[in-house]
Amino acid sequence: MSNFLECKTSVLPLNRVGVELVSTQSRTGLNSSPTLPILCFNLVAISLLVLFFQGVIMANQLKSLFPQKAKDFEKSDQAKIFDRKNLYDYLDGGAELYLAYDFQRLVVQDYKSGETSITVEVYSMETSQDAFGLYSLDQEGEDVQIGDRATYGSGLLKFWKGNYLVRITDMSGNDRFIEAILDLGKNISQNIAPKGKPPELLAKLPADGLVPHSERFFHKQIILNNLYFLSTENLLNLNEKTSAVMGDYLLGKMNLKLLLISYPDTSIAKYAFENFCNRYLKTSLSGNRVIQKVEEGKFAGAELDKKNLWLTFESRDEKATGNFLRNLKKR
Amino acid sequence: MTRKEKISFSRRDFLKGTTLTTLGVALGLVSPEVLSSQETKKERVVIVRDKNVQDADFKVDKNIFSKLLDTGMSNLGGDNDPTKVWKKLFSSKDIVGIKISQMMTPTHKELVELIFSNLLKAGVNDKNIYIWDRDRVGIGSAEMHSLPKSLGYAKDHFSNVIKKSTALINVPGMKSHWLAGAAFSIKNWAGAVDNAVEYHTEDCCSSFGALVANPEIKSKCRLIILDGLRPLFNGGPQVDPKYLWSYNGVILGFDHVAVDTVALKIIQNKRDEYKKEKWVLNPPPLHIALADTRYKAGTSDLNKIELIKSGWQEGVLI
């Protein structure tokens, strides 16, 4: 963390500059009675400088996570840094995925050994819940003991720790550099101090029958449609104020997908429930639970429970879906 | 039809196959028999592959790649001499813009070099060949990889390279895409405007077709060469390497929608093969079918596509 400490000391002159700006104006006599516009200008200038240096500190913090080398691989080139404004420069068409969570910054660092390279991406999020959310979208691979949770497969290590999501990739798609990749991952993980806290909503998913690594956490419609396309329209009124968890279930011979959405209040939840029943299930409401036969001989279900809306998809058994929904409400 | 007009399309519509039927057929959800069998002029799409065009470390054999491209151009233009086909399409009077992709699964450099050498053979002046992605531009062979220049965008949001060009070649990568379903030749034009964010919408990016229907592109784009050496069949644009596979081919055509429909069928079949069950793209790439039905930019009906396949046939997936 030496870079971080170096950077912290560099903030001190900034504060002095801020003070100096104000006092210089006093000396010129222009502000013997300071006017509001000048004061505002100074405040804006100071705020911008503080924001700028906060960004520098954060970027240096992120850069300090990277070790100089791992096995035969050494850092090559300068790390590239992206924020919410320029993430498109790195991930055109992919940036929206990260912006759908509370993404703050990304640092990309290449490591080289001869002509081969490994790319490390460290995504910093505002909350550990959102870092978990991003991680949860693709948990395929073998479990490895790195960070709060990690998987490795075919040259890609992904892990979540604290407010960070880390991806380490060898594009060959094989395991030729697995040792270097895992070594890098362990080093980076050790440099991230606090452990993360998974979203509380996750605990509401029943454990019985939950397919391992199938649980997802998200907020917005574009993520839902990537996991399970429902509609081009936002029928469930998903947005940054909603939290949702989704999991795949194997219950005896029955598969289904379970989606739980938590809304800010009961009226919004009710509106979403009614909208879904009317416009997707195309059925009239009678109570807080609906099960409707849809295409391919499958059943979709919905149950409103105060601020929470439970939904099931892909079930082939109407009765079992009803029982499943009924038991959910008891949780 | 304006770019921002909203579409209402649900999973249930999709499974019924009553709306955007051609998409349902391409994804294997609807029988091809539901499509019209009327005899009409068919759009030609060419697939050409070679098992040895890249080695186990994905190093491209440029000699094999050159022959592969020659075969593709001959088949596309219906002439045994590929140079004649290039000359039919481009001349010394042209300023040619080559739109590549540099994102995540980038267009192979070897393909860019081969296109350059063929354009030169067709008589196009080296300094009249622009290669670009977003606002990184190279002029002439000396800058074809470094793309050191920036030419900016016009008021209508299109790249100034498009404005300068008399002819365009679209050379995208081939990948699935988490927000648009799939990203082939139509979506590649999102890298030619400065308001791409307006097309990356939560309705499955339904309006990409507006780009290819725009006269700036529709009237100038003379050739599409989809780089299918190592496509991505899940996720994207960010790559999980386990979902890359060596298809070892290119797909050529003149009609964006037809090329993308063929590419979509291949990606969907690869997904089904991988999972050993139907594994439909999420979200569905509505923009391909809508480029046909809404924007009239080409055909998404497989029955109206004349598909010519040559070279390595194992695993061609269509």
Question: Where does each model-flagged region fall?
Answer:
Chain A
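Soluble, non-membrane globular domain cores that form compact, hydrophobic packing
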Residues: 53-331
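Intrinsic disorder/low-complexity segments
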Residues: 1-50
